[in-house]
């Protein structure tokens, strides 16, 4: 919202309706962005974009660091994905996304890296670690973020967020892109699950 005019956003919404397609946007990454949107339109970025019909066909929000309960309602109502980018948000001091809140509210979360201009290390293992670690810090609870849930965010949910329905799980007839990890290496120990 912060880099586009209302007129341009209305055109995006019109196109989304014409093609019946989801819209993905960087949303509520910084407090400044949220405050400026509220000053301009009297609403948070998710509420403003929703008022334009932007998410009538679903989609998602990148970052989603500074959100309200009403924003969560927008995400739920439109079956949107939140794509968290913890490395970028850490580098730019944007804040910590409330991932545990999204999980509690059954809003699907995927993990992204943003881009090289705002993240020096486009490494999904690092991003998974940051999702886990930062969530624990934010929640003040070492058990607040389940490792298997984070793995799902980085794999299944990422594929679903991109509508790669033929590459979301390992199954006959689906596409696969695999890596092998040697769990016997010292840095992989101990294994708890």
PLM-predicted stretches and their roles:
Residues 69, 90-91, 119, 188:
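Short glycine-rich, flexible loops that bind phosphorylated cofactors or substrates
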Residues 51-58, 100-184:
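His/Asp/Glu-enriched, well-ordered alpha-helical/loop segment
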Residues 186-193:
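Short, surface-exposed loop/helix-turn segments at secondary-structure junctions
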